[in-house]
Amino acid sequence: MAAQASEELEKLKLNGQNGHAQEQVSAADEAADNDDSEDDEKEEEGGAEGAATGAAKKKKKRKPKKKKKGGAKKQSSPPRVPISELFPNNQYPEGEIVEYKDENNYRTTNEEKRYLDRMNNDFLQEYRHGAEVHRQVRQYAQKNIKPGQTLTEIAEGIEDAVRALTGHQGLEEGDNIKGGMGFPCGLSINHCAAHYTPNAGNKMVLQQGDVMKVDFGAHINGRIVDSAFTMTFDPVYDNLLAAVKDATNTGIREAGIDVRMSDIGAAIQEAMESYEVEINGTTYPVKAIRNLNGHNIEQHIIHGGKSVPIVKGGDQTKMEEGEVFAIETFGSTGKGYVRDDMETSHYAKVSNAPSVSLRLSSAKNLLNVINKNFGTLPFCRRYLDRLGQDKYLLGLNNLVSAGIIQDYPPLCDIKGSYTAQYEHTIVLRPTVKEIISRGDDY
């Protein structure tokens, strides 16, 4: 999920041994069946002899057939099997492990740092759990999203899958705070770069020539995995996507303990702006969107207060040990600058919200619903609809005006331009950097 500069701040191991085990079970079953057939023949012969000599012998009892053992559970299509059932020992796949650069090399071998890393196991398993949810949901989405589908259909399909795989439907009070959607599924099209998800009644349909940013979060116990990718259906945009993917990977490579944010931004911009893209006979330089940033993530808080720029200059703040960051970059064929535009859908309660006396009963009631169901996690209007709330806009706007709720309008470059996004969540462990959301797809 994007942070705006101007605002306040492996794989499932389901094959391998299982396949071999299933072959052994099948062979055992076949052998058992053959034994049963031989027993039946002997029984018939014995029955004939018994007719002549009397019932001197007892009939052999038929051996019960061995039941086939069920293999390890597999993910369904669409994804609905909770990830915890696929990993019953609660040990989830690691992300990509990268050693620190240069002066931080000692961290990989330092005994004290290794001890601290082991102490963080629960924290890491919650993040890895959420990351595996994200990977499985997005890989299904990438295969099944097609032009002609409505944005509502796409968003709800992703969100339903995340809720199923985390095991949290979010319909009971407090359930979504334990796990589920880390923030609403963003589906920002073409010149719109971020923070767009359909509100109720939206009829927008994905078109063949669209460039769609898919940005969603999955969380376990408030450990939000924030990762995004861009989908296109025309190879003309390939260079735009390549530029942004390269820029994001550059940012990930440069990130580390004690690294200055400004240095990361400079490296990202250099990588991004080395590309150009030709669309309809016109060549466009790919520009980094200078007022969009990555950000650190805290428990139940998607924008933790630190920003990771994607252009040079500015913030001299350093990354610190134990922090979690969303490294995200945005490229554009337009001005490389976004403004608020279109109807707002994303909202979140401010973590240090002021204590304000609310006059509107609708605002008081709505705040109570938000506190119990989302806390400081971002939500959208569709989520309020899903909880049975209605006629809430007046109260919602009142909460925004009071500074209790922050609204996040869609962020757009100039019309006619195209924007792309890639994003990963990284954990700055004491010994190594873990790209928690890395997958085979990006």
From Swiss-Prot:
One biological process GO term for this chain?
Answer: proteolysis
Q: Where does the protein principally reside?
A: cytoplasm
* GO molecular function term, any single one: initiator methionyl aminopeptidase activity
Q: Where is the composition biased (Acidic residues)?
A: 30-47
Segments of this protein annotated with the region Disordered: 1-92
PROSITE patterns, per the entry: MAP_2 (PS01202)
Entries under Pfam families matching the protein:
Peptidase_M24
Could you tell me the superkingdom of the organism this chain comes from? Eukaryota
Per its UniProt entry, what is the enzyme's top EC class, as one word? hydrolase
Q: Report residues binding a divalent metal cation 1.
A: D215, D226, E423
UniProtKB keywords:
Aminopeptidase, Cytoplasm, Hydrolase, Metal-binding, Protease
- Location relative to the cell: Cytoplasm
Q: What is its EC number?
A: 3.4.11.18
The protein's annotated catalytic reaction(s) are: Release of N-terminal amino acids, preferentially methionine, from peptides and arylamides
Residue sites binding a divalent metal cation 2 per the record: D226, H295, E328, E423
GO CC, alphabetical: cytoplasm
Co-factor(s): Co(2+); Zn(2+); Mn(2+); Fe(2+)
Where are the compositionally biased (Basic residues) regions? 56-72
Write out the similarity annotation.
Belongs to the peptidase M24A family. Methionine aminopeptidase eukaryotic type 2 subfamily.
State its role: Cotranslationally removes the N-terminal methionine from nascent proteins. The N-terminal methionine is often cleaved when the second residue in the primary sequence is small and uncharged (Met-Ala-, Cys, Gly, Pro, Ser, Thr, or Val).
Matches recorded under HAMAP family: MetAP_2_euk
- This one is known as Methionine aminopeptidase 2-1
